[in-house]
Amino acid sequence: MLGNSIQLIGKEKNYYMEQYKVKGMSCAACSARVEKAVSAVDGVTDCTVSLLTNSMSVEGTADAATIIRAVEKAGYKASKMKAGKQSGGATDEDDALKDTETPLMRKRLIASVVLLIPLMYVSMGHMMWNWPLPPFFEGNHVAMGLVQLLFTVAIMVVNQKFFVNGFKGLIHRAPNMDTLVALGSAASFIYSVYALFAMTDAVVKGQDDMVMHYMHEFYFESAAMILTLITVGKMLEAKSKGKTTDALKGLMKLAPKTAVLVKDGVEQTVPIEQLHIGDLFAVRPGENIPVDGFVKEGNSAVNESALTGESIPVDKNPGDPVSAATLNQSGYLLCEATRVGEDTTLSQIIHMVSDAAATKAPIAKVADKVSGVFVPIVISIAIVTFVIWMLVGRPVGYSLARAISVLVISCPCALGLATPVAIMVGNGVGAKHGILFKTAVSLEETGKVQIVALDKTGTITKGEPRVTDIFPVGCEEAYLMHAAYALEQKSEHPLAKAIIAWGDANNQTEAGVGEFQAVSGNGLMGVRDGKHLQGGNWNYISGQIRIAKEEETELRKQAEVYASEGKTPLFFAEDGKILGMVAVADVMKEDSPEAIAELKNMGIHVVMLTGDNEQTAQAIGKQAGVDEVIAGVLPDGKEAVIANLQKKGKVAMVGDGVNDAPALTRADMGIAIGAGTDIAIDAADVVLMKSRLSDVPAAIRLSRATLRNIHENLFWAFIYNIIGIPLAAGAWVHLFGWTLNPMFGAAAMSLSSFCVVTNALRLNLFKFGKKQRETA
């Protein structure tokens, strides 16, 4: 949501996703109206409106002017967001998240309360508590009525926004929450004015009994109290809504505003916008790193917790990458900028969290449908309530009070906020710990997975294999390893790293290999000094060599021993003659067994995918504690395995992004682990910045906690209206004698949205500890 215009890859030239600020929305009915109006514009393929951030995301080919006109025709105002040049720079996104509502609400509330106190004293103090009135009012009922009228008018002027927005919505045939408040308070006021005129006429005619009758028909204090209480609720709601975006606002504040540019050996402090790719910049101890780059000179420990949630500092040496907003703790670093502005890791995280908040979870669709028709239905119920009570013989004042109660107790805001506030808070909590959900859908659906498929290398293991055993056959160990080192030099397979690392450590010299060819998932071949080298697993190598039965038996027997220990045997041959075998083992991550155990405790079936042979795979799977091992899976075969697993339930595929894209895309939920600074992994729905496997169950628990919170919010929003509206209408009067004064209805309405937002804020208490249960 930071950029104002993004051309989508694979789309036609004029196809864009653009962000807009929307002004004038007060409830879910408003956002539904805007969404409907913009979606009807030719060229718009998708439109999502966020009531929480007062923003709108539009996808398609329609031009901005047409979209803005559609919003204005619906009765609201819109403007295109401007892209910020730097992650740390001010943008319209900052403005969209800035809490401008609370200060205004506070001023309105103070003015309303100051005016309400004398109004309540005059209208109810003498009658209810026998408080003394000024002598001027003794026997002067018209004066009492006029004073109440003046105070009420003043309070209505202070809260004129309800009337302006409410009646504007009515004119545009798009009634909203403000319409309900405006109609309720206006009806109370108009009827009270009528009662005041009628009482004045009775005073002139000397009809004392009618004077007292009409005195009791004054609802000035109800109109004023409704407006004041709704303002209290809106202020509490605005303040709480501001807190839901704290995590996102915190991310925006992380990047420094300046950087120390080093040019020709001279240091100069410049605005961060003046730093470009390739520039050198200096970072002293205690300073935040301004942009992404790598260390040219110096050594230090850098705290990356702002991005990853990992509190342990990471050592940085020449050549190591550094990220914007991380804290240099100990040494002086001279770095070269590689990514600046909106390309930094920090900006990408802000984009991701912000964009996720702009999307809608499937569960929100029910609330959106109800919100779209909620206000017209409530107005209809209020009219029917008034008519029914009049028909059964109740006085106008009583009938009107019931109708007003229906109007002011109904709350579409609670319905509209139930899902987005929970999504925003849940996403923010995840981002602070290096868990990034790309969309609201991914945050909702991750918790529903039943099967988790884990790619072995880089996910369960560290992806840092090492040579454990060397078994030469018919040649010296040095000859075998030199051949293996020469062949693996050109391989990109993770296991090749082990042999290359061994060769480097043992001062092996690089031998040129020509005609190199990699056979996907099986082996390698190449030519060295006129001789053909082959390397790979037994299935591949056995078809390339001639070997005596005794030698094969001995070799296979030793390979089985290695495999039973969780090691992967690699075979090498030259000109069709076996040279021997090298056993390689990857190191398991410290938290893998515990994370897998936690997944199993959550009722999730855990599957390990690996290209290793069955025996090696089973040994590693047993160490890790997985439920099922699928061995011999080639990189291009993972997608088919995922498709097969999906027949048994919802599948999450967890991989490090290397050769995993098709499988991540095929799975119901693709989770990329260990993304580090490369978080723009298109195939993944969830991005885990660290290589901690424990973040997988944490992401699932957070998703479940968020979904549970949404259910609680929706339950409260629906049950509040289901119980409140009949109570306000007087449906239980004849059975239990229960009824509801309009003032209490307004108080209930003012608290409903506040309760929903406050409940969502409980997600900030979510624990990521190893032993924590699914609590929020």
What are the residue ranges of the model-derived segments?
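Transmembrane helix-loop-helix hairpins at the membrane interface
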Residues: 104-258, 369, 470, 737-740, ...
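ATP-driven catalytic headpiece of P-type ATPases
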Residues: 105-107, 326, 447-492, 522-607, ...
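Membrane-embedded alpha-helical bundles of multi-pass transporters
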Residues: 128-142, 171, 190, 429, ...
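Juxtamembrane coupling segments of multi-pass membrane pumps/enzymes
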Residues: 199-203, 209, 224-285, 316, ...
